[in-house]
A protein has these predicted regions:
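Conserved N-terminal beta1-alpha1 strand-loop-helix module at the mouth
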Residues: 1-75, 81-82
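Short beta-strand segments at enzyme active-site cores
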Residues: 40-41, 90, 120
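Short beta->alpha connector loops at strand-helix junctions that form conserved
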Residues: 62, 91-93
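Conserved sugar-transfer catalytic core signal across GT-A, GT-B, and GT-C glycosyltransferases
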Residues: 75-76, 109
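Expand to "…catalyze enediolate/carbanion chemistry for C-C bond making/breaking, isomerization
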Residues: 1-9, 81, 85, 93-120
Length: 120
């Protein structure tokens, strides 16, 4: 059985800036292989500002279970892909506690993410 490579996730929550994007991408670009898999999950507004490097991946902190439509403030899976995300955090305890996300919604989000090609 092949051993899984460790995954290090940096969830920025509602923090960060364009300066931090630059600092983080500069620091990550000089790291030497082999590394654990690195996943950076900044606020969605910063996703497209990260340069595309092979030594890390980008993720979003949330996404809508809806594909398109009049859902003010929501972000679709396709929008995340366009912004450069390969992953998305779904079912985080803060979303459950603060926004009342239930298993049915989380299940739908997982399905939408996988169907779109995102890794939940």
């Amino acid at each position: 059985m092949r051993q899984r490579k460790p995954l290090v996730v940096a969830n920025w929550k509602m923090n960060g800036s364009l300066d931090l994007v630059q600092q983080m991408s500069d620091a990550l670009s000089v790291l030497k292989q082999p590394l654990p898999d690195i996943l950076i999950c900044p606020p969605v507004i910063f996703l497209s500002y990260f340069p595309k490097h092979a030594n890390y991946k980008l993720g979003a902190q949330n996404m809508s279970e809806q594909l398109v439509g009049a859902f003010t403030g929501e972000i679709s899976a396709d929008m995340l892909l366009t912004a450069g995300a390969t992953h998305v955090i779904i079912g985080h305890s803060e979303r459950r506690a603060l926004y009342g996300e239930l298993d049915a919604v989380i299940s739908q989000k997982v399905k939408v993410a996988v169907d779109a090609g995102l890794t939940p």
